[in-house]
Swiss-Prot record:
Record-linked Pfam families: Acetyltransf_1
Location of the N-acetyltransferase domain: 2-150
Source species, domain of life: Eukaryota
Keyword Protein biosynthesis in annotation: no
InterPro entries per the UniProt record, alphabetical: Acyl_CoA_acyltransferase (IPR016181), GNAT_dom (IPR000182), NAA30-like (IPR044542)
BP terms from Gene Ontology: protein maturation
Protein name as catalogued: N-alpha-acetyltransferase 30
Swiss-Prot/TrEMBL catalytic activity: N-terminal L-methionyl-L-leucyl-[protein] + acetyl-CoA = N-terminal N(alpha)-acetyl-L-methionyl-L-leucyl-[protein] + CoA + H(+); N-terminal L-methionyl-L-isoleucyl-[protein] + acetyl-CoA = N-terminal N(alpha)-acetyl-L-methionyl-L-isoleucyl-[protein] + CoA + H(+); N-terminal L-methionyl-L-phenylalanyl-[protein] + acetyl-CoA = N-terminal N(alpha)-acetyl-L-methionyl-L-phenylalanyl-[protein] + CoA + H(+); N-terminal L-methionyl-L-tryptophyl-[protein] + acetyl-CoA = N-terminal N(alpha)-acetyl-L-methionyl-L-tryptophyl-[protein] + CoA + H(+)
EC number: 2.3.1.256
CDD domains for the chain: NAT_SF (cd04301)
Role of this protein: Catalytic component of the NatC N-terminal acetyltransferase.
Source organism of this protein record: Schizosaccharomyces pombe (strain 972 / ATCC 24843)
Keywords, in A-Z order: Acyltransferase, Cytoplasm, Nucleus, Transferase
Amino acid sequence: MVTIVPYSHQYLKDICQLIQKDLSEPYSKYVYRYFVHQWPEFSFVALDNDRFIGAVICKQDVHRGTTLRGYIAMLAIVKEYRGQGIATKLTQASLDVMKNRGAQEIVLETEVDNEAAMSFYERLGFCRYKRLYRYYLNGTDAFRYILYPN
């Protein structure tokens, strides 16, 4: 049975391994720690019984001195568990916390050629906001997506 639980330090190694394998951007362990040590309440993991199968890493802080902004930094699901709604449940858990804590907007970036991610976030209500040229280390452009919570 798949459950969504709040981030706990015991999952940091699993998160690092999954994201390094699945996402194109090479993050150091310090990037993960930056998010989960300062804003652990916004990150969640998915478990199948006790097996780690996915995570969403997020934060929320003041943007440009005026706007309380949530940010989805990373989302990854173990390959054989994709297509089962787990990413939606993880993301929704983070969105709910951000909304409850007063987020005025929630943003994320994804590669311009990642059709699956763009479709996923659009289904959750995100709108394409702008193109970020050569955003990723590999030179790929990104689209920034934004959601204005109700």
